[in-house]
């Protein structure tokens, strides 16, 4: 069993924010793969289904970003899951727009949602880092992630959310490199990421 957590802030005010791309991904996973309707659970909204014949629970914490760990801990305890069973989808300013990287453990790069989760369940969970780009200077980061994606960005955002959801089953069995490669090649084919130098196919 796996717990897939999408990070974001609840409410229509934040719906289109860069910070909410994690919510967008788990919403699309639920839609694409026929998960059960969302219902209020674990200080958030949860939906159950299966990917690659493995039971998966999707979770959108309603605690606001900085307290995401409370909801994740509640769900993990209920299902008796370890941090290794948890996959977190989140915005990543240190990656260019439309890029995706997967890693287990490591630093939190100033992300308050990850900080909260690590404080509650430990650090060795899988993170799917969804690139939203950096505004250029540290002082603009807060406004950058709490603003909506620009109209010009929406095509790649919709494509990325779709491709990540399509290939989400690979994350259930920790086929992280295969997941990264499939997402990278699909986004490249759609013209949203440039062709890499020889030998770089979207790996870590």
Swiss-Prot record:
Family per record: Belongs to the PTH family.
Summary of subunit composition and partner proteins: Monomer.
Organism whose genome encodes this protein: Nitrobacter hamburgensis (strain DSM 10229 / NCIMB 13809 / X14)
Keyword annotations of the record: Cytoplasm, Hydrolase, RNA-binding, tRNA-binding
Chief location of this protein within or outside the cell: cytoplasm
Positions of the record's site feature: Discriminates between blocked and unblocked aminoacyl-tRNA: 9
Any single biological process term in GO: rescue of stalled ribosome
EC number assigned by the record: 3.1.1.29
GO MF terms held by the record: peptidyl-tRNA hydrolase activity; tRNA binding
Residues binding tRNA, per UniProt: 14, 64, 66, 112
Subcellular location: Cytoplasm
Gene: pth
Segments crossing the lipid bilayer: none
Signal peptide range: none
Name of this protein: Peptidyl-tRNA hydrolase
PANTHER family with a match to the protein in the record: PEPTIDYL-TRNA HYDROLASE
Catalytic activity: an N-acyl-L-alpha-aminoacyl-tRNA + H2O = an N-acyl-L-amino acid + a tRNA + H(+)
């Amino acid at each position: 069993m796996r717990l897939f957590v999408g990070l974001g802030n609840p409410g229509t005010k934040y719906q289109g924010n860069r910070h909410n791309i994690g919510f967008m991904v788990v919403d699309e996973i639920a839609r694409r793969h026929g998960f059960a309707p969302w219902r209020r659970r674990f200080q958030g909204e949860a939906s159950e289904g299966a990917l690659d014949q493995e039971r998966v629970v999707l979770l959108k914490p309603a605690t606001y970003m900085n307290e995401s760990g409370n909801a994740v801990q509640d769900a993990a305890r209920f299902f008796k899951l370890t941090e290794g069973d948890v996959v977190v989808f989140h915005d990543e300013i240190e990656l260019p727009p439309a890029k995706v990287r997967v890693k287990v453990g490591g630093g939190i790069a100033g992300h308050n949602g990850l900080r909260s989760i690590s404080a509650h369940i430990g650090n060795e969970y899988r993170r799917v880092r969804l690139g939203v780009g950096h505004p250029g200077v540290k002082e603009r980061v807060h406004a950058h992630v709490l603003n909506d994606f620009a109209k010009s960005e929406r095509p790649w955002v919709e494509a990325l959310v779709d491709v990540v959801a399509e290939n989400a089953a690979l994350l259930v069995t920790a086929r992280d490199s295969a997941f990264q490669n499939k997402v990278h090649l699909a986004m490249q084919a759609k013209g949203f990421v440039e062709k890499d130098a020889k030998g770089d196919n979207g790996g870590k």
